Amino acid sequence: MIDDMIISLIYQEADEKLLNTLYEIFTYLNSAKLARFTLEYLISGKDESDDLFGLIPVEDLCKQKYKLLLQRLHISKPSSSDGDGTRELELIKEKLAFLEPIKADYNTSIENTTNLKTVNINIEYAQRDLNWTSVIDDINKKVKHLQDKEKSQELSRLRIKDLDPYLLTENPIERVRFTIPVPEDESTHDDDVEKNDSKEVDKENNEVPDGEILIDEGSNHINSDEEIFLEAREFLEKEINDGKETQDSKNPSEKDVEGSTCKLDHIPANREVIEGEKHISEENAISKSAPMIQRSSKRVRYRNEESSMEINDVEITRSCFVETERFFENLNSYLDLFNKEAATNLTLTNIVNIYVPEKNNNDENSAEGYVNDFLFILNDWNTRKYTHSLFVDDDTPAGSTASKSTEDEKIKLMEVLSTFGKKGDSLNSDLSKDIKDISSYETTEEIQKFLHDINENPCHYEELKLLILRKLLSIQRPKGDFKGHAAYCLITDTIWNSKLYDRIREWTIQCESIILNHLRLEGCDALGISHMLDDFSFSVAIYEILVDTYISIKDQINSMTSLNYKRTTHKPNKATLNNISLELVKIGDKLNRWTQHFEDLLERIDLSFAMMDQDFFTYYCRYKWSFIHKEKSQNTIWQEKGFIMSQLHELHDNISTKKEAEAHIPLPNYENINEISVDSIKTQVTTTSILSILAKILYAKPGTNNDEAIHLLETILISDSSPDESIEALPLNKEVSTFDKDALIAIKDFLEESPVDMKLSSWNILFSYYDENNQFAKFQHGFEQNVSFILYYLNSNTYNGLIGTKFETLAKVLGSYGKHVRIFLSHLRENNWKLSRDSHRTSSSIERTFSELLKLFELFYLFSIHEEAALISSSKLSVKARSNKAYERFKDIFISTVSVIVIYYKELLMNTVKIEESKVPSEIEKTIGNLICDFHEQLGWRRVCDAAEGLFLNLAQDILVAFDNNLFEKQLAQLISCRYHYSVSIDTFTPANHETKKTAEFDLSSTQRMADFILPLCFKKNPLKATPKSDMKLLIDEFYEVVGDPDFDSCEILSRNDSLFEHFLESTSITSRFLRDTFYGLEELDFRNPPDNANIIRSGLYYMQGLLMFASYKIRKKSTQSRAVELENIIMLLKNDLVYCTNRMESWFLLGQAYGFLVEDDLIWTSDKLTVPERKIGTANLQRKSLICYLMAINESTKANIKKDLPLKTTIGSLMALFSKEMYNAAMKPMDMHAFKVQNIPRFIKKPTGAAFVSVSTSSVNSNLCLKVIQQSLHIAIKSKRNDWTYYYYLSKVQRKLNKSPRIVLDTLQQASNIAKEQSNPSDPIIEPHYKKCSLIYKYAKEGSLSFQSGLEFLKNDMVINYEKGNKSIEKPMDFYEIIVECLKAVISYDKKRWHHKPRYRLAKVLFEEFGKITEAKEEISSIVSLKSTNKTLVSIWKPENERPGKHFYYTFQYAHFYVVLLSSDRNLIGLIQMLPKLRRSNSIMVSLYSLWETLCSSICKIIRNSLKVDEGFTERFMSSSGYQKFMMNSKSLLENMKGDGVPGELQIHLCFLHAITDMKKLNNGFGPTSLIDDTMVAIFIRIYLYFEKQSNNLKPMGTPEPTESPNEKAKKLAKRDFFPLISDMLKTFRRDIENILKDQPDIYNDFVSCSDKKVEKEGVVGKENNVNSKILEEEQSREVIKTPELKMDSINFESVSDKHITQNKLEADTILQENNDKSPKNNGIKDNENSIPDSRARTLDEMLFNKGLEKKVQGESPTAKKQKLNSDHHDSASE
């Protein structure tokens, strides 16, 4: 209520009455402050009020009350009016007595609030004396207990450190009181000190109430923190120790675990405790080392058990290493080659004697001590110790870059040097031994007195902390004499335990901002030096604590980010690292504020005067010393040392003037700030100078002049110059003081005295600089010096005198060497494996280094022998079984050493004979090559040749490729197998499997070098005949992928050659002149040589890649449909090969084949390209290009010297054969010379009809010339290869086309038959020549060119036909035809897979034409042509392998047409109707479908018309005699009668015919002619109409004119279109009736036709004109011959054009080609055969197709004579 009333005064001014009432209430409640507030509010109303209230003057009574109130508050002096005040109070009490209950509640509330703000701290101690640690812990514990739980939980998640727990309390602590118990008897203290110490910790932990959450772990619960820290550390160590061997066994490739731990908090623990823990952990590690080695997982133990069972405990003897001894003897023989010339004694020791000493020799092992040490660690490899040491200098950790690793190396060296800088930081025992413990000053009585003073004058909690901090940190002046009169400071003059220091540090960090503000306020008022000293000493102590904390956090961060920590498996937590970094930033900000405070403070005083005071001098030196430490920790760039050096010099000058006692300031309680003395300052000066010098080296910027830095490090490390002279000659800058020279001498001495790690790190940095600056010569010199240093050190007393760390040191040295030698080899690789030849380097220095390298080679070869022994005997344990990482590292170092030895050996050998690198004789090449081969054989046998990322393989490849490839082709093949994993066999040699990893990928440089070796291997045998194996194909593919396609845009010459090539192919026509020039080698292409970097392509890379792709394409083509994209890629490769001006005949040859395959691909899959002439142009152009490429191949082969170039002889035969076949395909069907007519670039030609672009012109050569060229080419091919039946087969066909005599043709075909029989596979025989022989003999005999007896002789000589009745005389042609039928059946039976269709067709044709056996002919042809619904296609035939492309579609047309003839002859109307839908869908499987469709439709119509006795003018006569009106009326009446009465039986066949014709019309719509179909439909309907006209009495007789309504009106005539609606209505009406009829009578069509034919025969009306078959044939004869669409010329024109071209090119053809010796006689006319009798049988299919010219000749003859003439001049298209 009171609060509300007071708040209300804020919003609105109160009147005087209200204020007086409030005054009385507050006075009654004894709230003097509130009463004063109301009176002051009332008095100030006149000045502050904006209302009328301000105009009323203040009453004097109010002022009187205010005076009395001030007197009660002791603010003013009492006056005589005290009685008035007393009376006033009594009146108020009486007036407000009714508020007594409220007053009581109010007072209770005030008392409770006061109690909450007062804290009583119970000081608990049972020990002998009270100490500040327990006091501070009790205070912290109490404050922690008062914390608000919700705030604690919320802030615990934020993990905020150094937070004052007072900030989390619920109520302010305005008063602090201490409860101090009475101490117990001293005797009990002596017995229970240890017990109470532990109880104190336990009580501290257990007194925390339940549910209380600890917030500030570091500040509020230190004991618990220490326990957690120690437990975590022990747990981590245990896990590391237990898991190290297990992890190494489970995954040998993992990094070895190092037993290092990380700090869990940035607050350092007690140094004594930590040191004790380190000592204990080391002892535990030593004691547990043995069981740690045995610890492994079950899986590893099981594996070890298995290995122990497999490897017996065999005794290792010298006989186990016979190969090694032989190998070393071989190596010594190589060394002897220049030992004689150079008078040296380079030799290798028999290391087998070292590894297996002789038993009879009682002397100790003669090997050096480090060799025995090496053998010891090999057999007893300690992963934890040795692996870490082996990799301690590794600058290429996984996942890091070279620059990053170099930085790590620098950081590591700086850490070591920083340790060196701290070597003088330890306390001076003489000066520090008198420092007492804090308990000697702060006794129990002193602390109790201090606490009693606090109780007497209660203070705020923060004020209490400041009082305690001041007492412990600031200057103290004792009042008594028992401690002397000198002032002292507890933080510097006494030794604290770490727990007290940690508590004070926490309080300092928590309160430093409050202290700083307080000191600043006091500093403004401080005038005297004595008062200032108190604050100054306090400030300096605070500053020292902050600096010490800052350095500790900084060291922790550096430890977590250091290289050693990164190598452990416990990676730093990013969140933890971020939190610690944030703490570092916070402490840094605090330090900056305090530094500014000191600067402000020192500016306000006279420093020189103040320094005269000893106390001020001490505190000033302490400040400067801590300031220097802060700057050193913050300064990471040691080049900028000027400021620190100046501060050190200043401090040194100040302190050197004092006495020794005064000049020594102990600082015993700081971990990172050592004591102040002259020696410690000098040590810091020296350390800073050294770090500055090395910083110039470590952090020298690239691109700047770093000669001084490099020279410094060279002076320190390289021992080929005097150190003193080097220092004097060193061009030091002016800034470098005398300390630099002293520091340089000191660091050299320090490196000599310190462990070898320092020198190894220094070498690493020196080599890093050489590497980064690409100073190869210096790197080589440094490497040689480093090798000398390593051997010197390993043989020194320093190494031999090591105890406990000897083996680890050996591993470190060898690991450092391994790293340096690999960097050196990388530079050698860039320098083409050549050593630097500086003027100061002599042969003696090379020999010295080589001899030292041989020592290292012997050492590391012992590792290989040891691994071999581990495979033999279980007494030897492989390093790999312990640490795969170490095993791989040793392999790398071993291989690197071998590689360096090869390089130095090569250098020495050439120096011995004094030759240049470019003039190495073959003997030297052979020696070096043999050395490499021996090394590779030995290393490969040991399965280590691929180590060091294939370094040795790379070296060997680069050296051997530069030598004669023929000498080392097997070794190069082995190198390719090991390095690139491409196994290339050479003759009988196959590379051995060395079980290597793929260590390299081909690049352009390596591809060019290896192609010079690989491509000649491919050409050892003609690749066209002996295609390289698949292993070579993989390698060629890799080469091509690296080289890629030509870049025409960047090379003008290549672009020109490419354009020239394209123009040549696109614009060249095949003329007789072009044929002549190519056959005589006169054709030239003006290609220019491309740049010199195209050697690999000129060597045949593109050609070989195209050849291999072509070979695989041919294999896939047999099983699956080929892809044009593959051929396009092949064409591109071959074209690119020619564009590089190779003029390679084989490339032209393969190009011709590739284009030929494209032509075949266009022709064999669909007939689209053959049905439309325009579509054939593209295919013809491809065929033209194919022929041009073949001719260019012939042109190039003619240029070459065939007699000397043996591989070309076999190629010429294949070239001529394939060329002749392609040209034959171009000249014959289906292309029909089209390739000689087309041109890819259309020409603009003026014609009589107008100018136009023309793509097809007349043929450039005649067919006769083409056939002669083909014949001559086949003769050349046969001379080259006489066992290819296709050559003879095609030659016989060409000879027949050239009208050679039948005997010549059949003799050639006989040879083809014999070869084919010999080469046939029983499961897939060759039947083409055998069938061709039967077909030709049949044709020759029928046309009279060959006698029957001669034909029988040829049939008898065929091994497949083998006609046994050859002696039988033949008197009649029918007998001969029967023999032909038997021979064809024999050929058919010879076809096991039933793929060939031509013999069956020929057999069916002979049966039909010669014997009239329609049924048997149908049975034979039915295997090809099928009307069954199960067969989707009409004609089902396979394409035999040797069938020419495109002929397939001609055969399908031929067979389908013949089938139509058979069905028509058999008057099988059902078969013809069933053929309609299948034929309609056959557009893609045959040519001339429209013609065949027309034939089929006309055959069906004519059979139906003949059956219904419908002649040609039947419909016209009916329409002219019938009136339109009458017909339409009668037709409607007809439909109505049929609906009512049903379909009469006599008209059922008419409706079925009408249904069939209507369906045929639908299929024919838009496809073929419709006049005959429409006329037939109308005729059928007329027959139905006439039937009803006769049967119905209501209809008028036919022919009665329809009366017109008007004489002047013109009568409408009846047309065919008037019938179609009626027909449609009739079919719709009786659709179901028709379906039922066809279902019940499926043979109704053929039955009706048969009955009609019989009826005609009975009526005697059978005549020639009425014979259906003859009529169909005569109608077919009158039709035009089916012509190939693209050749719009008949046979007469074709022959005339050919003869014309033959006449024009007679002279050229005679000079190009020579006729064969077996030319046909001049008179090639057809001889009359007495056995040839004209046959009057039905026309054949071929006659209907190809005899238009003969039809014209016999147009005037009678039909019978015409038929006989056609049969006598028969030509069969199946001969193609």
UniProtKB/Swiss-Prot annotation:
Keyword Nucleus attached: yes
Biological process, per Gene Ontology: chromatin organization; chromosome segregation
Main localization, broad class: nucleus
Transmembrane spans: none
Keyword Nucleus belongs to the record: yes
Compositionally biased spans, kind Basic and acidic residues: 190-206, 1716-1742, 1766-1776
UniProt-annotated stretches for the region Disordered: 180-218, 241-260, 1709-1776
Keywords from the UniProt entry: Chromosome partition, Nucleus, Transcription, Transcription regulation
Location in or out of the cell: Nucleus
GO cellular component, one term: nucleus
Molecular function per GO: nucleosome binding
Function: Has a role in a nucleosome assembly pathway that is required for the integrity of heterochromatin and proper chromosome segregation.
Record-linked PANTHER family: CALCINEURIN-BINDING PROTEIN CABIN 1-RELATED, CALCINEURIN-BINDING PROTEIN CABIN-1
Similarity section: Belongs to the HIR3 family.
Name of this protein: Histone transcription regulator 3 homolog
Lineage: Eukaryota, Fungi, Dikarya, Ascomycota, Saccharomycotina
